[in-house]
């Protein structure tokens, strides 16, 4: 599934995992965005405890709920992607380029599993999975494998392929959002399903994979076998729910960062009532924000987590706040201090 930033891809993935879990079926939502996973796990664990306490008070259950029990329940269907990957790297060996279980390993390690429990695995921001070279480097440096022959997409698909009955892999993909070293993009997922052992899989993809931000517009051409290929336009989310009144904003930002000057200029002309200014002066940016913030409005500054050169102007992008406390603490708690939340001196960063 593809979609513009803020269109609701993550929401669809989460809702699918939660609905499947509630129905007694096994599904897991996986994300490489650690703060997101931590906040979600904590929020759902608190909700679980609150609901179970209500059931206990009403006499519907005799079991007192615990936070530990709630966390275990939630982690069954919302996990960090790298922890899921590492779990299925346990107890395997590479034989002639193929993954095989180590003889006797899973008999002596009953807390481990070779075959995933879940039938549905949902990978959010799937374009950020690692290339073969990056995963090989990482596993070699950590002493796990000397020469691992799989990319992260190929390995994750191979995990679900171990199922004897059925399995579904859902990839939520943002176009052109491979932002860190070694991130594979949609190309690596396609190369994975091109492997002969996966030719029995049905592949459902968005028709927007032919757009330029997905493997340079050649994603559909990269697929070798079209016998089980199903192209569905409904697998693309085209409207941003974050800014539904300004759908062109995401388009403008994409064009600006891609240095598409003519296209960006045309799009900006449509956004006449949307406040967009461009400057290289931090002081001017702060001044503009203060002048245009009205009433109870709050302003802030967003900085890239990789922009360490900003340290020269006292912007510490390495700062790691307590995400759970920031997002989930009740606003009426006395210990929460929001006095500085309207002063553009602290910086958020997006990983």
Where do the language-model regions lie?
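Hydrophobic anchor at the beta1->P-loop junction of P-loop NTPases
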Residues: 1
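Conserved lysine of the Walker
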Residues: 9
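Hydrophobic positions on the alpha1 helix immediately C-terminal to the Walker A/P-loop
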Residues: 12, 16
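Walker A (P-loop) phosphate-binding loop of P-loop NTPases
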Residues: 6
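Core RecA-like ATPase module of SF1/SF2 helicases and allied nucleic-acid translocases
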Residues: 48-49, 56-60, 68, 194-351
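Signature of the SF2 helicase/ATPase Hel1-core->accessory helical subdomain module
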Residues: 122-221
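Conserved Walker A/P-loop ATP-binding site and its immediately adjacent core
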Residues: 25-45
């Amino acid at each position: 599934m593809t979609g513009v930033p803020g269109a609701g891809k993550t929401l669809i993935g989460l809702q699918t995992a939660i609905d499947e879990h509630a129905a007694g079926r096994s599904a897991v939502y996986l994300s490489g965005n650690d703060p997101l996973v931590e906040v979600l796990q904590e929020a759902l664990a608190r909700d679980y405890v609150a609901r179970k306490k209500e059931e206990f008070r009403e006499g519907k259950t005799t079991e007192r709920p615990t936070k530990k029990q709630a966390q275990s329940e939630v982690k069954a269907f919302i996990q960090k992607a790298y922890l899921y990957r590492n779990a299925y790297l346990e107890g395997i060996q590479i034989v002639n380029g193929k993954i095989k279980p180590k003889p006797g390993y899973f008999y002596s390690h009953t807390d481990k599993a070779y075959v995933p429990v879940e039938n549905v695995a949902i990978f959010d921001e799937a374009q950020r999975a690692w290339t073969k070279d990056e995963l090989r480097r990482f596993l070699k440096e950590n002493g796990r494998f000397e020469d691992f022959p799989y990319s992260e997409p190929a390995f994750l698909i191979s995990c679900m392929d171990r199922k004897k009955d059925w399995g579904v892999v859902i990839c939520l993909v943002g176009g052109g959002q491979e932002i860190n070293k070694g991130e594979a993009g949609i190309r690596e997922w396609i190369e994975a399903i091109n492997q002969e052992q996966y030719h029995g899989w049905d592949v459902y993809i968005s028709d927007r994979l032919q757009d330029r931000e997905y493997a340079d517009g050649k994603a559909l051409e990269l697929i070798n076998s079209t016998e089980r290929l199903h192209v569905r336009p409904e697998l693309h989310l085209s409207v941003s729910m974050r800014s539904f009144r300004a759908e062109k904003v995401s388009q403008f930002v994409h064009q600006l960062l891609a240095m598409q000057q003519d296209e960006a200029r045309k799009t900006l002309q449509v956004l006449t009532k949307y406040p967009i200014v461009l400057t290289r002066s931090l002081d001017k940016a702060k001044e503009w924000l203060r002048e245009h913030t009205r009433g109870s409005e709050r302003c802030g500054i967003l900085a890239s987590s990789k922009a360490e050169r900003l340290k020269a102007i006292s912007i510490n992008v390495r700062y790691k706040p307590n995400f759970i406390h920031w997002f989930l603490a009740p606003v009426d708690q006395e210990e929460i201090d929001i006095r500085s939340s309207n002063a553009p001196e602290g910086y958020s960063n997006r990983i």
